[in-house]
């Protein structure tokens, strides 16, 4: 499964480390990653690939990590993301 993971919140130390450590624990490989900092607002977008077939559990674990870090983490199946953003 491939997924698009977005992270948004106030910038602070440990966001990238926390999110990527959780992805590693979930055995997800980061295919692409981009992050931006604008006026104290942190955003990161990743395409990840995992063999984890339980998408709901994958989403829930990243959501819990987001709450712990004080950021919003949104996970969407890559195929759905692409279909929604097709011109």
From Swiss-Prot:
Annotated InterPro entries: ACT-like_dom_sf, ACT_dom, UPF0237/GcvR_regulator, UPF0237_ACT
Taxonomy, superkingdom: Bacteria
Coiled coil residues, start to end: none
Domain ACT residue range list: 4-76
TM stretches of this protein: none
HAMAP family: UPF0237
Family indicated by similarity: Belongs to the UPF0237 family.
The protein, known as: UPF0237 protein YjhC
